[in-house]
Amino acid sequence: MDIQPITTYTGKVVPLFNDNIDTDQIIPKVHLKRITKSGFGPFAFDEWRYLPDGTNNPDFNPNKPEFSGATILITGDNFGCGSSREHAAWALKDYGFNIIIAGSFSDIFFMNCTKNGMLPITLGENERKYLASQKEITIDLPNQTVSANDKSFNFQIDETWKHKLVNGLDDIAITLEYEDLIEQYENKNKG
């Protein structure tokens, strides 16, 4: 799963206003048998997404025709709580989400999103409700704004995560940015 740079991003939204959506609800443990990051998308929100007979649940917002192709998930508070499985971020990315806007995130889940090229954004309830009522919204990561029509909202993000996402860098690429310093240190401290 390559990490694509995120600078300005416009996408279709889907609301899923549940609080405390945990990683087992995002990707049930029964589907954690893969050894790669891909292939988890069909199992994202498995217990909500499908009816007992395996057909799509028509009441689950992401299954509704008006939300088809949504790449921005707008959700409640404490998103990604529960176990620290990175599979939850993999499943959401593989499903097609690039941006998740919530009232709050589990710290580990937030980090797993950024490690996998997804931008997690924290906004208040009124802002999320307004954005969820729009068909498309635009995120400007360098300026840290989310906008739709005539309204714009600021969000906070650590400069390290921002740098990573704007430049499409994974952990190895970040380390390689310091290759000269690492080499200097190793040469200086040869035993």
Swiss-Prot record:
Q: Name one Pfam family in it.
A: Aconitase_C
E.C. designation(s): 4.2.1.33
- Under which pathway is this protein filed? Amino-acid biosynthesis; L-leucine biosynthesis; L-leucine from 3-methyl-2-oxobutanoate: step 2/4
Gene3D superfamilies annotated for this entry? Aconitase, domain 4
Give a yes or no for keyword Transcription in this entry.
no
| Enzyme class label | lyase
Q: Can you supply one Gene Ontology CC term for this chain's record?
A: 3-isopropylmalate dehydratase complex
Kindly list the biological process annotations in GO that this record carries: L-leucine biosynthetic process
Q: Is Zinc-finger included in the keywords of this UniProt record?
A: no
Give the matching InterPro entries. Answer: 3-IsopropMal_deHydase_ssu, Aconitase/3IPM_dehydase_swvl, AconitaseA/IPMdHydase_ssu_swvl, IPMI_Swivel, LeuD
Assigned keywords, A-Z: Amino-acid biosynthesis, Branched-chain amino acid biosynthesis, Leucine biosynthesis, Lyase
Q: Which reaction does it catalyse?
A: (2R,3S)-3-isopropylmalate = (2S)-2-isopropylmalate
What PANTHER family does the record tag this protein with? Answer: 3-ISOPROPYLMALATE DEHYDRATASE SMALL SUBUNIT, 3-ISOPROPYLMALATE DEHYDRATASE SMALL SUBUNIT 2-RELATED-RELATED
Q: How does it assemble?
A: Heterodimer of LeuC and LeuD.
Q: Which family, according to the similarity comment?
A: Belongs to the LeuD family. LeuD type 1 subfamily.
The protein, known as = 3-isopropylmalate dehydratase small subunit
**What species is this protein from?**
Staphylococcus haemolyticus (strain JCSC1435)
